[in-house]
Amino acid sequence: MNDEGDLLQENTRDEGNETEASRMSKLRRTRKKVTKQHIFSTEVGEMDVSNSKERIRSQMVCHTLGNMSKPVVGPGSADSHLPQDDKDSENQTTVIKPSPLKTSASAPCSEFNTNSNHADNTWEDTQIPTTPHLSSRMKHIKQEMAKNHLQFVRFEATDLHGVSRSKSIPAHFFQEKVIHGVCMPRGYLELIPNPKDDEVDHIRATCFNSDIVLMPELSTFRVLPWAERTARVICDTFTVTGEPLLTSPRYIAKRQLSQLQDSGFSLLSAFIYDFCIFAVPEIINSKTISFPASTLLNNHDQPFIQELVDGLYHTGANVESFSSSTRPGQMEICFLPEFGISSADNAFTLRTGVKEVARKYNYIASFFIETGFCNSGILSHSLWDVDGKKNMFCSSSGIEELTITGKKWLAGLLKHSAALSCLMAPAVSCRKRYSKESKDLKESVPTTWGYNDNSCAFNIKCHGEKGTRIENKLGSATANPYLVLAATVAAGLDGLQSSDGVLASPGDSTDLYPSKPSEIPLKLEDALVALEEDQCLRQALGETFIRYFVAMKKYDLENEETDAERNKFLEYFI
């Protein structure tokens, strides 16, 4: 690993005069340069970072500002004792790289063997310099808290399943916790399958008993209309030494978006979710016949739908449309596209919000798939220039066709579809839909794509006011939205960097050439193998995360039968 603080990303792109060809050429260059300066850049200026305490202070200030397009990433990791074949550090494209405060190199896991006093001391001694941007944001938040007579603020973070894990803080302690963070046991988010499991020996079992720190991104502060006198703020997770948690799905997504930005692009995306509304003890509208988008079903319980949509709007998650879906009690909700991490934040907000609103009406809202049909989780996305002014998928010819950039992006998605399916359909039950049209017993099915074809895994839409976009339909609603976003960007970027794999024109074969046709494994076990063997995704998402994810899923498979009773209750949480 390089010396602390010695790595900074240099942004050398000329945003105004890039052609598509120059973008392709640029993507093949080395995207990391080494400098010898200890400079910490923020939107309010630069400061010299000269010691460990200053570096932690700098990291916390930039993070608190809530700059979602430029995530805070440290050069080290929570697992710095690992052999340095871990690609996390080698492939980070970051704006800020404050050096972590390290413990003795002779104690590989010593940074985890901490108690709450250690955690408090680490952050307590750090005084946050006040910036105009931070002061303005805090002033606005204080006004909101007073206006709404808030009593509590939830500090929320996502676990591997996309489930919100949080601690509620009395409102009068909010500013203090913004500065010092909120401690939470690491095992709450990483969900260790078994403390004695040798497959996760890259993270020692004792590490799961240590604290991590939830640091709020203030731009995500929202009053929750469905929770009495309560607000929430989405947090990023750090070790007590100020290093990002490498298994954090939101951190992984922000890192991939940073890679995309450094390559001269931005992502406009939105999630489309199916979820089920249950009454007690049966499904609402539980008829054997299905009427998708039926007006009567759309308005079956108007107060519930109105409160949900209005509540999501006030949390910043703009619902574009909703309707009944293909199964009894199943609803579809579509979000308005947004740039950056916001689309995943909106999906994360929905996953908790819909359950809280449903509970007020004595319903259960669930994304979990157990009854034999699928709740889908589609990521509709398009690639834009870094300024968000030009759709890089949209052909100027006026015909239904992707640009070369779009074709390369799609080629990357197809190339990595087997590994992508592992992250996007992470349970046995949600992989059944891959073979629903096939009567033959197969190990895999071809990955399909097409124009305006909703039966394909990747559906290209060129119509409508949104412009050309690709719907990634591999996902189920149980997948973590941050991982879906991160993996899609990683695969697409690899397609842009590749010199082959250009798609045929619409009139020719829909296969890739010269690459071999891609396949989606039907069994989760085979998908896990594909993920382990996919060097691109291993490098992009990080060795630490991949090894942990695979270990946890293997544990789930081994205990699938014994967990059947436990799974009956997952609909309350997933």
UniProtKB/Swiss-Prot annotation:
It comes from the Eukaryota. Transmembrane segments: none annotated. Residues 91-131 have a biased composition (Polar residues). GO terms for molecular function: catalytic activity. Residues 1-36, 66-131 are annotated as: Disordered. Residues 148-242 form the GS beta-grasp domain. Residues 11-23 have a biased composition (Basic and acidic residues). InterPro entries: Gln_synt_N (IPR008147), Gln_synt_N_sf (IPR036651), Gln_synth/guanido_kin_cat_dom (IPR014746), Gln_synth_cat_dom (IPR008146). GO terms for cellular component: cytoplasm; membrane. Residues 249-574 form the GS catalytic domain. Residues 25-36 have a biased composition (Basic residues). May act as a component of the cytoskeleton or as a chaperone for the reorganization of intermediate filament proteins during terminal differentiation in the lens. Does not seem to have enzymatic activity. Belongs to the glutamine synthetase family. Dodecamer. Interacts with BFSP2 and VIM. PANTHER family: GLUTAMINE SYNTHETASE (PTHR43407), LENGSIN (PTHR43407:SF1). This is Lengsin. It comes from Canis lupus familiaris (Dog).
